[in-house]
Amino acid sequence: LLVTPATLCDAPSMQDFLSSDNRTQTAKHDYCTQPVNLAGLPAATVPVKLSSRSLPLCIQIIGRYGREDEVLSLAKFIENNVQFPRMQLI
């Protein structure tokens, strides 16, 4: 298993997101996840911390082809041990 950041930063504000074209936003925010998706590898994203703006920061767990069970097992372990706060949905 390989653990990487899921993104390079927390989520942009709507104004920041709309200030760049889709290709630029994709390059910035999908940098870590896109290659894994294109390779067809199993992966899961798990929140582990809140940013200074109280937005989730996540890690990505990448597994071997066909071993979703390993990815989900580690994701569950991290989820149970990190105790990430539940967010209030508006």
Predicted segments, located by residue:
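Serine-dependent amide/ester hydrolase catalytic core
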Residues: 1-38, 88-89
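Structural helix-boundary/capping segments
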Residues: 38-90
